[in-house]
């Protein structure tokens, strides 16, 4: 790690859906930026394995509730709603694109979205799985026929699917390739945006260095994917360890170094409002909820 005193230290929660934080660490990209980075891997695993915690009490909420200065990531809906509820701000200077898939147990007979009428789908509330599931199901089912179950984090959801606690659950990377390998039925899949969700007290130069390191990591991953596939082992949730062929896991979440569009932000807020998921938001304007690292 680079030295440089407290002014160059930043705490980061690695995002389990991507490899970028580990690549940046291993390749020394942050050290080159003069950053001293503390990766909070235990928080990442708690996020993945929590069992249906309530909003504001989830592992990803705690650093913000406890005034710990941290850089995290979440789906676009979650990042915006969290910021609106007073938990950090989102960074509009870049975004991620991640995968989701709704899987069902093989014996359930559930093979497509239309089969999920009145079937509880396991999600983590106010997180990517929650919003993507609603968005996918509302395209084919009446609202009154859509059911969700707050099972918890993505690792916990795969464990619940294995145990038969739910017939269907929405999974993310790296659980998607594991579920594929284990023979669960993919009823639907798609992609969604993620945003960086950060403590507003973090100095802009630290976030700028963090993102520059991630840009280099994104370029390295796209250029030499095979080199970095073994790093997926670090994102496997406790309880899911296994002798996996990480070469089949794919790239995971990728980053787009373009501004998050304000019209998409408005659609994100409107979606949350339509489903009544904005109840804790005290603010809903782009400028109030975002913090840019770029000079105007």
Predicted regions and their residues:
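A ligand-binding cleft/hinge motif common to bilobed small-molecule-binding domains
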Residues: 72-85, 134, 162-184, 270-271
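Short, glycine-/small- and polar/acidic-enriched structural segments
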Residues: 2-141, 148, 187-189
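Short Asp/Glu-rich motifs
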Residues: 48-51, 180, 198, 291
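Pocket-lining segment of extracytoplasmic ligand-binding domains
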Residues: 148-149, 153-235
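Conserved C-terminal helix/tail region of periplasmic/extracytoplasmic solute-binding proteins
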Residues: 273-296
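Secondary-structure end/capping motifs
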Residues: 204-279
């Amino acid at each position: 790690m680079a030295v440089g005193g407290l002014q160059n230290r930043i705490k980061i929660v690695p995002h389990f859906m991507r490899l970028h934080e580990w690549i940046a660490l291993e390749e020394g990209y942050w050290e080159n930026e003069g950053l001293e980075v503390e990766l909070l891997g235990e928080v990442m695993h708690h996020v993945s394995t929590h069992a249906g915690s309530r909003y504001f009490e989830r592992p990803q909420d705690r650093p913000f509730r406890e005034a710990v200065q941290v850089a995290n990531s979440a789906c676009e809906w979650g990042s915006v709603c969290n910021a609106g509820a007073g938990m950090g701000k989102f960074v509009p200077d870049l975004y991620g694109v991640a995968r989701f898939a709704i899987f069902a147990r093989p014996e359930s007979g559930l093979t497509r979205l239309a089969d999920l009428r009145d079937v509880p789908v396991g999600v983590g509330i106010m997180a990517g799985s929650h919003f993507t599931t609603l968005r996918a199901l509302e395209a084919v089912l009446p609202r009154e026929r859509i059911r969700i179950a707050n099972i918890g984090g993505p690792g916990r959801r795969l464990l619940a699917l294995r145990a038969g606690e739910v017939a269907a659950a929405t999974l993310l990377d790296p659980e998607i390739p594991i579920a594929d390998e284990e023979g669960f039925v993919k009823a639907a899949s798609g992609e969604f945006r993620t945003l960086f969700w950060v403590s507003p007290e973090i100095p802009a130069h630290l976030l700028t260095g963090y993102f520059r390191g991630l840009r280099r990591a994104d370029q390295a991953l796209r250029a030499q994917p095979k080199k970095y596939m073994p790093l997926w082992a670090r994102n496997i949730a406790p309880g899911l360890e296994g002798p996996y062929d990480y070469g089949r896991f794919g790239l995971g979440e990728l980053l787009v170094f373009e501004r998050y569009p304000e019209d998409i932000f408005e659609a994100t807020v409107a979606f949350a409002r339509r489903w009544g998921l904005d109840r804790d938001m005290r603010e809903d304007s782009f400028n109030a909820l975002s913090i840019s690292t770029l000079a105007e």
